[in-house]
Design a protein with these regions (language model features):
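N-terminal, polar/Ser/Thr-rich
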Residues: 15-53, 171
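Solvent-exposed beta-hairpin/edge-strand motifs
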Residues: 68-100
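Long, His/Glu/Asp-enriched segments that create or flank divalent metal/ion-associated functional microenvironments
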Residues: 523-570
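Acidic/His/Gly-enriched intrinsically disordered linker/tail segments
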Residues: 392, 396-460, 468, 485, ...
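A surface-exposed beta-strand-loop module
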Residues: 87-163
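Extended, low-hydrophobicity, Ser/Thr/Pro/Gly-biased non-transmembrane segments
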Residues: 130-255, 259
Length: 570
């Protein structure tokens, strides 16, 4: 028995990944990739006091053919565009570079650490500092209907304020710590990326880095992060130190809750886990099922997933955000999770809308979209601030492909109508104008326009390109694109050029088609402007044969709601 246990232990060590966060096949494939930076962070989180503090060390090697006198970081908790607060939430102190105290400069979220001497090509520097932060608290979690009504009200009565997505926030159940640390900006041949967050769309633009993070938190809290847990060590005062390793990831997120339940499954070398509040068990189990199926399909059609974990975590997101992607972990808004026993009163309109199958399918679509971001954001990087369509339109179309694979082309067409065409048509009905897809996030006038053009028209553009190429060539292009740009940064024309290389005889047609959908304004002719009647018909389409929904009543209730929303408060 002892010999058996010894052999078993040796076998486990033999097959255990040297880099716990990367699959064995990914370790072989990425052996020549050097991380942009090495993060070593120790943080202690006080969930009850809504604060955290710690020490961060970042080692950076200059791999560009130009020197730099400083390192540029972003302190996103101090970005009003993200937190909607003028007050900073995170402070930095005791800054050193290679052990020497140095000068710093902070302007909003931008934080420069000036070096003792210019960092030349191939030279390395290590900077370190202490930090302490306060975690903003949201007033409460809204259900899907309430959130949708808030969004509609903000569209009809614009204030000029952009939404707070809740990426860095907490409510009474969950701490959602996205972008919580001091993050090194991207450094390339043009220098440091100094572009601020536009207040809409994705926040960050980073190269793959390596993280070693030690998180100390009360033992009663479940801690879920990017990367893989190496071990947990008991700490003082009933706390645990969670030691986490994450290789070749562009970001690092932490989620905490005392109320999390977990359900998981293994696919290949990857553990796929769903974390959700106990009261949302039914939805949490559906999330896992969707994540598993999306993972299997995308792995088959796009290429291998490189990480040993994929976590889908319920989080308190707001401002219309259904989910937010991070490497190896995606969050899904609590508003999409249903309580297992719903005993509260709802409005007539909400009761009517809840009978639509479209609302049951929304959670599935969002999970598929967010899982797709592991391929189109985590692995294939892009400048999401400058070219948001590269990952968002592709992830949205990937969710359509998921529906087509599992439910057929008719189901996929319905999702394109619900998730893409409706957004564009609503945008036009409310007076918005058509825009090119190939624009920076900052160029769009609010979240509805951003969603209509980037998520909607952009994804429909990929569907048209697929129809032109045919399935065999299109999916060959996707596989080649994924392999070529894994852990790299894809540009706005890279997928088009890969597609043209797969189908050179069609090069000119693909050029024209890409320009038509991504650079020009043909939304009305390609998608249509729509009407309120058509919009509601699309929402109601697909109800069961014993349909008890009165569409005339639905129309009256919706028009009544619009009148209420558009009437200024007295």
């Amino acid at each position: 028995m002892k010999n058996f246990l010894l052999c078993l232990g040796m076998l486990i060590l033999l097959f255990q990944s040297a880099d716990a966060s990367l699959t064995r096949s990914a370790q072989r494939e990425t052996a020549g990739i050097v991380p942009a930076a090495l993060y070593d962070i120790s943080v202690t989180i006080d969930p009850e006091g809504l604060k955290y503090s710690g020490h961060e060390k970042v080692t950076f090697t200059n791999r560009q053919q130009k020197s730099t006198n400083y390192l540029l970081f972003f302190i996103y908790p101090n970005d009003p565009a993200l937190t909607k607060s003028k007050d900073p939430f995170l402070t930095v102190s005791n800054v050193k570079a290679d052990g020497v105290a140095v000068k710093t400069e902070e302007k909003g979220p931008s934080f420069r650490i000036y070096l003792p001497e210019a960092l030349q090509t191939s030279k390395t520097v290590t900077v370190e500092f202490d930090f302490q932060a306060i975690i903003p608290q949201q007033s409460g979690t809204k259900d899907l209907f309430s959130e949708a009504m808030d969004q509609l009200s903000s569209i009809l009565n614009p204030t000029g304020k952009q939404p707070d997505y809740g990426i860095f926030s907490s409510n009474k159940d969950i701490l959602n710590l996205g972008l919580w640390y001091v993050a090194l900006s991207k450094f390339d041949q043009d220098g440091w990326d100094e572009e601020a967050y536009a207040g809409i769309g994705d926040v960050s633009y980073f190269d793959p880095s390596s993280f070693n993070v030690r998180i100390t938190a009360p033992a009663a809290y479940q801690v879920v992060t990017t990367g893989s847990s190496i071990k947990k060590v008991p700490a003082k005062e009933g706390k645990l130190e969670h030691q986490v390793e994450s290789k070749l990831t562009r970001d690092f997120v932490i989620e905490l809750s005392k109320q999390f339940e977990q359900k998981s499954a293994i696919r290949g070398q990857t553990s796929i886990r769903s974390f959700y509040l106990t009261k949302h068990r039914g939805s949490g189990e559906k999330v896992l099922d969707t994540a598993l199926r999306a993972f299997e399909y995308f792995y088959q059609e796009f290429g291998p997933y490189p990480y040993t974990e994929l976590d889908v975590v319920e989080a308190p997101l707001y401002g219309g955000a259904g989910g937010v992607e991070f490497p190896g972990l995606v969050t899904v808004s609590s508003m999409l999770y249903k309580e297992d026993e719903m005993g509260y009163n709802t409005s007539t309109l909400e009761q009517l809308l809840n009978q639509s199958p479209a609302f049951d399918q929304l959670l599935e679509f969002v999970v598929a979209h967010e899982v797709a971001h592991q391929w189109w954001n985590a692995v294939v990087g892009s400048n999401s601030k400058k070219y948001p369509f590269i990952d968002e339109a592709m992830a949205n179309y990937s969710a359509v492909l998921y529906f087509e694979h599992y439910y057929g082309r008719e189901a996929a067409e319905k999702q394109m109508a619900m998730q893409m065409k409706i957004n564009y048509q609503m945008h036009r009905m409310l007076g918005g104008s058509d825009q090119p897809v190939l624009l920076p996030a900052s160029a769009y006038n609010g979240p509805l326009e951003y969603s209509a053009i980037v998520y909607g028209k952009g994804a429909l553009g990929f569907d048209s390109i697929r129809k032109e190429m045919g399935d065999e060539a299109f999916f060959a292009a996707i596989k080649k694109y994924y392999k070529k740009f894994s852990f790299q940064t894809a540009g706005p024309y890279d997928f088009k050029e890969v597609a043209q290389s797969i189908q050179p005889r069609n090069k000119e047609k693909l050029e024209v088609m890409f320009k038509h959908w991504m650079e020009e304004e043909h939304g009305d002719e390609d998608i249509g402007q729509g009407s309120l009647e058509a919009l509601l018909a699309t929402i109601m389409e697909g109800n069961s044969t014993d349909n008890t929904i009165d569409e005339q009543q639905l129309m009256k209730e919706f028009e009544k709601l619009l009148d209420q929303i558009q009437t200024p408060p007295q």
